[in-house]
Amino acid sequence: TALPVEVSLEAYNPLIPMDVKNSAIPTGIFNIKVKNRSDSKVTIDLLATQQNAVGFTGYDTIVGPNRRSAKGYGQNKNAIISKAGETSIQMTGPAGSMQLSAYADDVSSTASWEDVTSLHRDFSENGKLTGEKTASSPDSGKTVDGALATGFSLQPGEEKTITFVLSWYFPKGSFGAFDRNWHDWAFLKGGSMYENWWANANDVDQYIKENFSYLESTTKLYHKTMYSSNIPRYALDRISSNLCVLKSPTVFWTKAGYFGIWESTSNNEVWGGNCKHVGHYAQGHARAFPEIGRILRKQDLHSITREGLLPARDGGNVDAMDGHFGSILGVYREHLLSDNDEFLYTCWPRTKKAIDYAINRFDADKDGMLTGDHHNTLDCNASGTSPWIGTLYMAALKACEQMAIIVGDQKAAESYQAIWSVGVKNQNEQLWNEKLGHYVEKSEFLEIKGKRMKVMTDATNIDMLLGQWWANQLNLGQLYPVDRTKQSLAKIHKNNKFTDVEGSGYKAAFRDFLGTGDTGWFMNTYPGEIPKNTILYHNEVMSGFEYAAASTMLQYGMLEEGMDMIERISERYDGRFRGKGEVHMANNSCVFGTGSPFGEDECGDFYTRAMSSWSALLALQGFIYDGPKQTIGFKPTWQPEDHASFFTTSKAWGLFTQTQSQTAQTAEIAIKFGTSQLENILLAAPENKTASNISVKLNGVEQAIESSKQDGNTISIHLKSTIEVKAGVTLAVSFGLIHN
């Protein structure tokens, strides 16, 4: 309270959905805002210091006096450069470059300082720094630290923001997490994508300076638009924060264009290869950046084997049928998030080969029931049909039917539809357990060729309806009957919920992600004894799986259950550190602990599967999109009478709002960034209401409607011609409501 000023820090890396390059800048931007809250004029001095860390790999420890010694250090050089409105420390070394800049006019500097005491003494005298303008490593294995300082005066009530920018450029850096076991991943060499755009850290810095207004204003516009949603804050936090995975060491992008995703970031063992049975849960990356989704699908298909298997990991030959089907569904998602059919025509031959492989190997009699030994994301092998992988199979078949129709492969479309038709019937009849009130696994063999199978039997499995989760996101329709689907979801919420209270005696079979008092949902629970050969992770709690289950509940309007799950997850990632002694992560997991709001964990931090959280947004807004058909739709399950939510299309994002009264309904699609071509609009009227006098306006100008119809509560509007909705433009739909 004695400090006469109020100081706040805003730190970010530019994040602009649809703009991949400007969301992949190697930089950190720090805005320090100071406000004079006193009655007198005050003088402020700010100091920023940075070690020249070029050469530090992350594997070793920085040691020695003033912590300037590390294995990769040596030949590090600092140089002060000044120009109008900016002073920088250029930091170079054999491994690349860094740059710390102050975007201000009155900046003092030093290329090197001896120790913290001397730096503080120099700065405290008059708020300015003295020292050499160049410096270099005194010895092999050592580096130097530089600093910048700037000062200004504020009148009472006045405030000012000073921006510091730290940029880096490491063309020879290692990719991925702190893991030496995957250094032979075939695509690791060849530099970083940003080498195609900039030459060094100074080049990066100058790009930021020249484009600062766009980068900052558009990043903030994205944040403002996302949080203009009236969805609860805890849900928006979890939906949006998991995009941090794209900003973490979990992800890399090579100069040649290969987009690599580790399962996570860890200081020990972590798995690479763009793991399909983990990655297919992720939704946020493809919705915010459709270009990334298309790159990943093309990579998946590039790795297809001669027989048609999509390997669990790029460059391998191990199957994982959940990931196999998930990748096929991803192809259809990426098609829907395109502007035309070109992507699909390119991908269809190998996509068809992949679904045909699965049919021939696991469903040779084409009855929709899977047979034989198959691996999955639970790191085990199973045999037979579970509702989990069974629904994924059905959803993949339906997606392939739709894709075949688009490319004109009618014979394939009819074949997939025939298998789907008998498959959903057989699965519904054979997997439903009336006594338990949910679907169960139909195990086939306990052992195949000496390999012990893992079973779920009659477990309430959190992924029980994962294929339906996918199907609803892609508007593929219902798989199992709605009443049984909702009954099964209710059982997941009730049976698998667990709170780790003091004295509960909870002991996870492998890893414990729950702190004392935390609540989560187990992977499996059983009505009786736990089978001896059950899955290893049966009583673990992992958010990536929970989001998928919660979002499926939300898709069916089960708001109490679905939002309960998301709120409990948000409480676990509330910023309170849960470390060893409270949780048990196992050696190959996030041994640092858990609780970070910006890095959810499983087998490591910033876990890829957690990007499934974006599906909650899609479920709450009832989003429907088909870019090539120029179709957009919203059927909110969250407050349809007063709804607001962020949305993305193939090239744009914005805010959707909807209001309903007893006699009228209005919906607005406000584009904030990019452009969308639209010809068809889908909306939902309240139950037992019929729409009348439909009007469509683009920024107040009436648009001609070719036709409109209502099927149940779904209103379909077909415009007479395609309209282009640009940033700053709002498309408004209004109609009367008549009680049936």
Ranges and model annotations:
Residues 8, 13-27, 31-275, 404, ...:
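Acidic/polar, glycine-enriched structural segments that form the non-catalytic walls/loops
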Residues 29-31, 649-684:
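Carbohydrate-binding surface patches
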Residues 367-370:
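Acidic, glycine-anchored loop motifs typical of Ca2+
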Residues 43-51, 672-690:
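Surface-exposed beta-strand/loop patches in extracellular or lumenal glycoproteins
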Residues 2-24, 647-659:
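Low-complexity, acidic Ser/Thr/Pro/Gly-rich terminal tails and inter-domain linkers that flank the onset
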Residues 699-720:
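Extracellular/luminal ectodomains and secreted, surface-exposed scaffolds of diverse proteins
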Residues 266-311, 324, 345, 349, ...:
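Active-site core of glycosidic bond-cleaving carbohydrate-active enzymes
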